[in-house]
C-alpha cells in the first residue's frame, strides 16, 4: 500500500487496484500538486464539510464514479444539492467494510459547515477516520483540537500511521499535536494541515523533532509517499 501527501489534508491511498482520495482540496490550493480533472479514484473519503476538505469532491466523483464516504449529514447534502449518487453515509463510532478494507469514523473537535447561495448550512459532526487496509491501521485525524480520548483511539486500533494537523488557529498546533502523538502511540506520525495559508504557517520538521523519544515522525513533501 502506498500513501502520498498532496498538501493541506489531501492524501491518496493506493492499495492493489483501488485508489482512495481523502479530503481532495485541489483547485485553489497552491500547495497541491494534483489536477482535479485527472483524478479517477474509486473512493473519496471526507472528514467534514468545510470547503478546504470537500474541495473538488463533486467534480471528481461525477467524472470518476467514485463512491463518497462521509458523515450522513454531509452525504445528504451532497446527494440533494449536488446530485451525487454513489455515497456511503456513516456516523461517528460506526465502521463499515468496503472492497479495500474497513473505515471507522471517530470524533473530532472542529466545525463542519458551508455557505451556499447566502445560506450557512451545517453539515453534521466533523470526524477523524481510521482505515484498516492490508492489516494496517491508518488514523487520519481530520481537523481537530487535542482531546484525551485519542488515547482510546490508539488502544482500540493499534496504529501504524497517524496523520495529525499541526497548523494551529483552526486546529491543534504543534505542541498539542505532539501530545496527541503521545496519546495515540502510532508507529509513525505525519504532520498535515499547515502552510496552506498564512494563519497556519508552521515548521513541520520542528514538530517532528519535538516528538517524544520512541515516537517516529516524518515530513512528507508535496507529492511524496510512503509504502507500508
From Swiss-Prot:
Cystines in this chain: none
Keyword Manganese appears in the UniProt entry: no
InterPro entries documented for this protein: Metallo-B-lactamas, RibonucZ/Hydroxyglut_hydro, UPF0173, UPF0173_UPF0282_UlaG_hydrolase
Alphabetical keyword list: Hydrolase
Transmembrane stretches, start-end: none
Gene Ontology terms for molecular function: hydrolase activity
SMART domains (UniProt xref): Lactamase_B
Entry's family note: Belongs to the UPF0173 family.
Protein name per Swiss-Prot or TrEMBL: UPF0173 metal-dependent hydrolase lin1612
Organism: Listeria innocua serovar 6a (strain ATCC BAA-680 / CLIP 11262)
Phylogenetic lineage: Bacteria, Bacillati, Bacillota, Bacilli, Bacillales
